[in-house]
Amino acid sequence: MDMLDPGLDPAASATAAAAASHDKGPEAEEGVELQEGGDGPGAEEQTAVAITSVQQAAFGDHNIQYQFRTETNGGQVTYRVVQVTDGQLDGQGDTAGAVSVVSTAAFAGGQQAVTQVGVDGAAQRPGPAAASVPPGPAAPFPLAVIQNPFSNGGSPAAEAVSGEARFAYFPASSVGDTTAVSVQTTDQSLQAGGQFYVMMTPQDVLQTGTQRTIAPRTHPYSPKIDGTRTPRDERRRAQHNEVERRRRDKINNWIVQLSKIIPDCNADNSKTGASKGGILSKACDYIRELRQTNQRMQETFKEAERLQMDNELLRQQIEELKNENALLRAQLQQHNLEMVGEGTRQ
């Protein structure tokens, strides 16, 4: 977009912009730069708003940018909200005295949010205005918030001094509808016509969204500081490390003994060196096998005890039979009887 060089006088800048618009025609994009300076409310009231007669064709295109610059780098920008009617845009009536100054304000230079707010009767073409609109009832239009204008497309004024405050205003149609805001006003002249461009921080305008509350911290945060250790803490730390080392050594020694006791693990350990997990796994298998063998041995032992008792009973019966046989032999000898078995045996 073509932009005129900034002048020290606001009226001269506006006149130059109007002259350029007549030279380029209604189809060319226009840019207007205004400069106002002031440090307090008194300077704001004394600053006059000079708006020259600009033809309606000059504002036919909505790609119009308004840029505010400070007279000194990093200073405050004093700006005002003005209302321009169709008659003033068409060149009808008084061009300077009929301008209605809504309010003035000042802010420090830096990145600010730009908010565009439409009011009822905003079918008019945008006029050169910027600042906060006083509260009162009016129908809202979509707004567009632009952070740090001219940051991603390059400033129209290439020779601008770095560090100065710059604020641009775009129509809502070129930026896109992002949200809506309610603007209240009590002045009937504000609802008569014209479109207002409001420049302020987003917190002052975007109050329709729900605010998320953050719970306060219940206890204070106390970061750990490693540099405040006492000799006692160092001694306790050393003792703890020594105890832990001894415990690990004992565990390793017992695992080595297990590897020596288990037959298969001892053979594997001598070759490749089994790990602790492998040693413990084979130890569990060996213990399980020993338990099964012990159970079988218990059953066998019970059977042996039962057989032993049976043998004892049989032995007793044999002794009784031997005694009975000896008595019978003695009786036969008393009666001089020979046993048939013995005679034939002889």
Curated annotation (Swiss-Prot):
<dbReference type="GO" id="GO:0019086">
    <property type="term" value="P:late viral transcription"/>
</dbReference>
<dbReference type="GO" id="GO:1990837">
    <property type="term" value="F:sequence-specific double-stranded DNA binding"/>
</dbReference>
<dbReference type="Pfam" id="PF00010">
    <property type="entry name" value="HLH"/>
</dbReference>
<dbReference type="GO" id="GO:0010255">
    <property type="term" value="P:glucose mediated signaling pathway"/>
</dbReference>
<dbReference type="GO" id="GO:0000978">
    <property type="term" value="F:RNA polymerase II cis-regulatory region sequence-specific DNA binding"/>
</dbReference>
<dbReference type="InterPro" id="IPR036638">
    <property type="entry name" value="HLH_DNA-bd_sf"/>
</dbReference>
<dbReference type="GO" id="GO:0055088">
    <property type="term" value="P:lipid homeostasis"/>
</dbReference>
<feature type="compositionally biased region" description="Basic and acidic residues">
    <location>
        <begin position="226"/>
        <end position="244"/>
    </location>
</feature>
<dbReference type="GO" id="GO:0000785">
    <property type="term" value="C:chromatin"/>
</dbReference>
<keyword id="KW-0539">Nucleus</keyword>
<dbReference type="GO" id="GO:0045944">
    <property type="term" value="P:positive regulation of transcription by RNA polymerase II"/>
</dbReference>
<dbReference type="GO" id="GO:0071333">
    <property type="term" value="P:cellular response to glucose stimulus"/>
</dbReference>
<keyword id="KW-0804">Transcription</keyword>
<feature type="compositionally biased region" description="Low complexity">
    <location>
        <begin position="11"/>
        <end position="20"/>
    </location>
</feature>
<dbReference type="GO" id="GO:0001228">
    <property type="term" value="F:DNA-binding transcription activator activity, RNA polymerase II-specific"/>
</dbReference>
<dbReference type="GO" id="GO:0000981">
    <property type="term" value="F:DNA-binding transcription factor activity, RNA polymerase II-specific"/>
</dbReference>
<feature type="domain" description="bHLH">
    <location>
        <begin position="235"/>
        <end position="290"/>
    </location>
</feature>
<keyword id="KW-0805">Transcription regulation</keyword>
<feature type="region of interest" description="Disordered">
    <location>
        <begin position="1"/>
        <end position="44"/>
    </location>
</feature>
<feature type="region of interest" description="Disordered">
    <location>
        <begin position="215"/>
        <end position="244"/>
    </location>
</feature>
<dbReference type="GO" id="GO:0003700">
    <property type="term" value="F:DNA-binding transcription factor activity"/>
</dbReference>
<dbReference type="GO" id="GO:0043425">
    <property type="term" value="F:bHLH transcription factor binding"/>
</dbReference>
<dbReference type="GO" id="GO:0005654">
    <property type="term" value="C:nucleoplasm"/>
</dbReference>
<dbReference type="GO" id="GO:0046982">
    <property type="term" value="F:protein heterodimerization activity"/>
</dbReference>
<dbReference type="GO" id="GO:0007595">
    <property type="term" value="P:lactation"/>
</dbReference>
<dbReference type="GO" id="GO:0006357">
    <property type="term" value="P:regulation of transcription by RNA polymerase II"/>
</dbReference>
<dbReference type="GO" id="GO:0042803">
    <property type="term" value="F:protein homodimerization activity"/>
</dbReference>
<comment type="function">
    <text>Transcription factor that binds to a symmetrical DNA sequence (E-boxes) (5'-CACGTG-3') that is found in a variety of viral and cellular promoters.</text>
</comment>
<comment type="subunit">
    <text>Interacts with MAF. Efficient DNA binding requires dimerization with another bHLH protein. Binds DNA as a homodimer or a heterodimer (USF1/USF2). In vivo, the USF1/USF2A heterodimer represents over 66% of the usf binding activity whereas the USF1 and USF2A homodimers represent less than 10%. The USF1/USF2B heterodimer accounted for almost 15% in some cell.</text>
</comment>
<dbReference type="GO" id="GO:0005634">
    <property type="term" value="C:nucleus"/>
</dbReference>
<dbReference type="GO" id="GO:0000430">
    <property type="term" value="P:regulation of transcription from RNA polymerase II promoter by glucose"/>
</dbReference>
<dbReference type="InterPro" id="IPR051732">
    <property type="entry name" value="USF"/>
</dbReference>
<dbReference type="GO" id="GO:0000432">
    <property type="term" value="P:positive regulation of transcription from RNA polymerase II promoter by glucose"/>
</dbReference>
<keyword id="KW-0238">DNA-binding</keyword>
<dbReference type="GO" id="GO:0043565">
    <property type="term" value="F:sequence-specific DNA binding"/>
</dbReference>
<protein>
    <recommendedName>
        <fullName>Upstream stimulatory factor 2</fullName>
    </recommendedName>
</protein>
<dbReference type="GO" id="GO:0043231">
    <property type="term" value="C:intracellular membrane-bounded organelle"/>
</dbReference>
<dbReference type="InterPro" id="IPR011598">
    <property type="entry name" value="bHLH_dom"/>
</dbReference>
<feature type="region of interest" description="Leucine-zipper">
    <location>
        <begin position="307"/>
        <end position="328"/>
    </location>
</feature>
